[in-house]
Structure formats: structure tokens, C-alpha cells
Curated annotation (Swiss-Prot):
Residues 414-474 form the CBS domain. The keyword Cytoplasm applies. It comes from Mus musculus (Mouse). Pyridoxal 5'-phosphate binds at N146, G253, T254, G255, G256, T257, S346. This is Cystathionine beta-synthase. Belongs to the cysteine synthase/cystathionine beta-synthase family. GO terms for cellular component: cytoplasm; nucleus.
Length: 561
């Protein structure tokens, strides 16, 4: 059935990959040279799933669940997972000029606030049923946050210890909810590749190898992920639509949601077109040409990856669309303001694509959109006008009265040449240099001057005190990459918004370099390119703080009086 099913070596259909201990040992990988002690399983291992369209349910190797009605009094909050409402989208559909009926499956009505509650409960209960997860054990999971919340919720009810490993990009609201549920949280660098030991996947596996009786339920490979949607979510959709739908639109992260739903719809409603949504900067979409972009980072959380998760079956997706941050957040805000649906950013991604894809549908046809999570996790992000302005996703109202300096350019500031640090300098030496020069932070650049990240005194000292690095370690191990770049042509008003949230902003300019002369963002070596192609590199011009802005305003006001 759904992807992630292991195929035993004798050819018979096996169980879940993460629960098949013999299979897991076969798949364990040693790290590359220089990292020989690392033991882990890749989240993009080729799927050995035996699902085929038209195959009888009786031939499935899996345990399957059947939809049941909710009792009047729930035994615990875990029974409030599933049976989410289907809601008609009225204003957005009308404004987009759609002829078809547009419906939203509102997954933020699950107990933990997202579609990931379904797979979290299913993975735990399947592991318990198989005898692999026992009282007193520890659950570890690398996640963008929502799966972590679902697991922490179930762990709180069932009494398991829960450790969640998530990238720094993810919102503080998610961190606060996880802490409230009793989970332990480990943050990892957002820009770390998935196969890096520093990534959320790599750190989770290191913890598993260190903590006795711990388990990575592994949403990227676990068949319980798409099975939860094959057995439940898809059946709910079919029941709510009386078996009649012509298009389904869903975003993809691990791919479990779209895979599980699509497989069931291919069986029960073969005429339904499956539309996949993948953010620009991710590589999940097909054909591969769709993924070609210079963009590598995006703000929408919970969707897209730099690898193809095992559970994602791209063969059941009829067409992929790429989404972008600006449209995603605009449509998420529209869903809230016009439809009253308190959803998150990835819901906006799905809806932005839906209004494009559904234009081909006619009157009497129906399109269903999956809205994955709630706005609760993003109160300080896209729900905030300041955040949207700072990120460039909103334009300021020209009619709003602003200070005299608001629309002046950053180039008006008298910025001195910045202190920069090479990635090979030690933490100990960097701290000494910063203290000697009286700086709190400095850009870290490679040999060609391209920005790799920032290093701050606070970040280095906290990492040293926590034992994450040693004084003799290179400063590249404590890079801070969530800095806010700003250009000389940006306004001081834009700078002001950034400084309301951060202690500094990095003033950058772009320089075109020949790739056979440039150094890569990977510290320590030149780019392996000989085709003479050119690329844009961000070069540091200066570092600006709130004090710099205040001094400029005060000095100008003195000269004007």
C-alpha cells in the first residue's frame, strides 16, 4: 500500500521500514570519510512499496483502520484527531472567476492544530501494536514542527519522553507549544543539508544512537505516514463529497499527505486530477525543469525539501505547480480575512495554486484543497504587518505619515568598512578580535568575499557554554545565517522595521562572479566548475545597528535646527 512499505529480501511484502529491525540494520549507513562513527538511515532511501492501482485490499501487508463516528464524550484528546470539516470557499472563488465549486479540507481542526496529528498518532499506535514502542521509551523526531507537536501531544497523553529536533527557521510559536506539551527541543541550522551531521535529520540520529530505548518514528520513511491519509483522510474526503470530486490540490513536505490521499482517490475516483504544490527552492516537483531556480531558501514552513522523501510517490501526482512566499502569505491572509479560516502559510500556498489549477474546471465540477495547519504557529510571522513589510511581502501605505528620514536610502548612512572574519579562524580568536575592536558581531566571508553568515558574541559564548563547540573549533561551526540583508537602495524605513526585531542588519551588494573563479558556500574549497558560467554573490558592504540609525537621525536634526 502507501509508500514506505519495506520489501523483504525473499520478495514478500514486509512491514514498516522503521519497525523492521533487521531491515533497519541493513539500511544503516556509515558516514563519509572523516565521519566514520556516524550511523544513520537516509530519509530518501528508495521506496520498496508494493502498492499497485487495482490491487485487492486483502493483499495489503498493512494493518488498516476504518472510519468510525466520534462518541459524544471523547476518552482523551487523541480521539479529536480526524473527521475534520469540509468548507466551501466563497469569496476567493468568486473573485478568481472560478466556475467550479471550491472546497477546503480544514486540517487545522485536528487536536494539535495540523494535518500532522494524523500521522503522529498513527505512527505511535502502529509502533505500539508491533511491540516496538514500550512504556518508558523515548520518541525522537526530526521535523519542521507540526509532526513534533502531534507526537508531543500523543506522548503527553500516553506518557512517553519526546525529543523534537527542528531547524532554526521554524517559528517560536511552535517551540513554545512543544515546550508546553513537555517535549525537549533541539534546534539545528536551517541551511544544513539534510545529509549533513548538523541537520535536523543528522542530529536526531545521533541522539537515537546515544539514548537507550529511543526510537525515530521517521515520518520520511514510515509507511504509517501515507497510510493515515489512505485509510482516513481520503475516506473522509470521499464521504464528505459523496464520491464526487474532479481535482484535489495538496502541498508536499514529506509527501505522505498527497501520496496517501492520491492513491485512494486513484482507486475510488479515477477521474480526479491530483495537483501537487511545491515551493520555489524545493526539489519535489516534476518535471525537473520546474525546480530550476537560484532561490534556495523560502519562508513558508512545513513544505518542500532538498531531497525526495521515501514516502513521496510522485507517480500519483498528475501535475505539479511551484508556489512562492509572496502569493502564499497573501492567500493565507485572504483565507483568514475573507473566509474566516484561521490557517497557516502553507494553506495559502495550496490555495494560491488551486485558483490557478481550477480554472480548467467547469460548472458542476469540484476542487478540494487541503489546508494543513493553523495560524497559531505564525502569529509573529505572516500575521504581523511588520514582519511582512520587513520581508518585502507587503508595500507600505504611502498615505501613512512617517518621519522625515523614513524614505531616505540606506546609502545616506556613513558606514565604515566592516570587520570580516574568514571561516577558518577559531572561535577563541574571533571572540578576542571582536572584544578588541568593540564589536558584537561580524560577517563571515569566504576567500572571494562572498557572505557565508554572521558570527555574534552571544551566539559563540552560548555555544561554548553549552559544550556545542570548543574554543579551538573554527568559527564556521557557529555561523548565524538568519541575518537580515538590506541593500544600499532600500529605505531607512525598511531598515527601521528590521531593527525592531533584530540587533543588526547586514548591508549587502551583489557582484557577478565567474564560477570557475568563485568559491562555493561550502567552507574550505573552490567551486568545482569549469564552464565559465557566472553567478551572483552577495558581498558585504557594512553592518548597521540601531545606534547607527539613531546617530544619523540625531545628527541630521541638529544640523536642521
Amino acid at each position: 500500500m502507501p509508500s514506505g512499505t519495506s520489501q523483504c529480501e525473499d520478495g514478500s511484502a514486509g512491514g514498516f521500514q522503521h519497525l523492521d529491525m533487521h531491515s533497519e540494520k541493513r539500511q544503516l549507513e556509515k558516514g563519509p570519510s572523516g565521519d566514520k562513527d556516524r550511523v544513520w538511515i537516509r530519509p530518501d532511501t528508495p521506496s520498496r512499496c508494493t502498492w499497485q492501482l487495482g490491487r485487492a485490499m486483502a493483499d495489503s501487508p498493512h494493518y488498516h483502520t476504518v472510519l468510525t463516528k466520534s462518541p459524544k464524550i471523547l476518552p482523551d484528546i487523541l480521539r479529536k484527531i480526524g473527521n475534520t470539516p469540509m468548507v466551501r470557499i466563497n469569496k476567493i472563488s468568486k473573485n478568481a472567476g472560478l466556475k467550479c465549486e471550491l472546497l477546503a479540507k480544514c486540517e487545522f481542526f485536528n487536536a494539535g492544530g495540523s494535518v500532522k496529528d494524523r500521522i503522529s498518532l498513527r505512527m505511535i499506535e502502529d509502533a505500539e501494536r508491533a511491540g516496538n514502542l514500550k512504556p518508558g521509551d523515548t520518541i525522537i523526531e526530526p521535523t519542521s514542527g507540526n509532526t513534533g507537536i502531534g507526537l508531543a501531544l500523543a506522548a503527553a497523553v500516553k506518557g512517553y519522553r519526546c525529543i523534537i529536533v527542528m531547524p532554526e527557521k521554524m517559528s517560536m510559536e511552535k517551540v513554545d507549544v512543544l515546550r508546553a506539551l513537555g517535549a525537549e527541543i533541539v534546534r539545528t541550522p536551517t541551511n544544513a543539508r539534510f545529509d549533513s551531521p548538523e541537520s535536523h535529520v543528522g542530529v536526531a540520529w545521533r541522539l537515537k544512537n546515544e539514548i537507550p530505548n529511543s526510537h525515530i518514528l521517521d515520518q520520511y520513511r514510515n509507511a504509517s505516514n501515507p497510510l493515515a491519509h489512505y485509510d482516513d483522510t481520503a475516506e473522509e474526503i470521499l464521504q464528505q463529497c459523496d464520491g464526487k470530486l474532479d481535482m484535489l490540490v495538496a502541498s508536499a513536505g514529506t509527501g505522505g499527505t498527497i501520496t496517501g490521499i492520491a492513491r485512494k482517490l486513484k482507486e475510488k475516483c479515477p477521474g480526479c486530477k491530483i495537483i501537487g504544490v511545491d515551493p520555489e527552492g524545493s526539489i519535489l516537483a516534476e518535471p525537473e525543469e520546474l525546480n530550476q531556480t537560484e532561490q534556495t531558501a523560502y519562508e513558508v514552513e512545513g513544505i518542500g525539501y532538498d531531497f525526495i522523501p521515501t514516502v513521496l510517490d510522485r507517480a500519483v501526482v498528475d501535475k505539479w505547480f511551484k508556489s512562492n512566499d509572496e502569493d502564499s502569505f497573501a492567500f493565507a491572509r485572504m483565507l483568514i480575512a475573507q473566509e474566516g479560516l484561521l490557517c497557516g502559510g502553507s494553506s495559502g500556498s495550496a490555495m494560491a495554486v488551486a485558483v490557478k489549477a481550477a480554472r480548467e474546471l467547469q460548472e458542476g465540477q469540484r476542487c478540494v484543497v487541503i489546508l494543513p495547519d493553523s495560524v497559531r504557529n505564525y502569529m509573529s510571522k505572516f500575521l504581523s504587518d511588520k514582519w511582512m513589510l520587513q520581508k518585502g511581502f507587503m508595500k507600505e501605505e504611502l498615505s501613512v505619515k512617517r518621519p522625515w528620514w523614513w524614505r531616505l536610502r540606506v546609502q545616506e548612512l556613513s558606514l565604515s568598512a566592516p570587520l570580516t572574519v574568514l571561516p577558518t579562524v577559531t572561535c577563541e580568536d574571533t571572540i578576542a578580535i571582536l572584544r578588541e575592536k568593540g564589536f558584537d558581531q561580524a560577517p563571515v566571508v569566504n576567500e572571494s568575499g562572498a557572505i557565508l553568515g554572521m558570527v555574534t558574541l552571544g551566539n559563540m559564548l552560548s555555544s561554548l557554554l553549552a559544550g556545542k563547540v570548543r574554543p579551538s573549533d573554527e568559527v564556521c561551526k557557529v555561523l548565524y545565517k538568519q541575518f537580515k540583508p538590506i541593500h544600499l537602495t532600500d529605505t531607512l524605513g525598511t531598515l527601521s522595521h528590521i531593527l525592531e526585531m533584530d540587533h543588526f542588519a547586514l548591508v549587502v551588494h551583489e557582484q557577478i562572479q565567474s564560477r570557475d573563479q568563485a568559491w562555493s558556500g561550502v567552507v574550505g574549497g573552490p567551486t568545482d566548475c569549469s564552464n565559465g558560467m557566472s553567478s551572483k554573490q552577495q558581498m558585504v558592504f557594512g553592518v548597521v545597528t540601531a545606534i547607527d540609525l539613531l546617530n544619523f537621525v540625531a545628527a541630521r536634526e541638529q544640523t536642521q535646527t
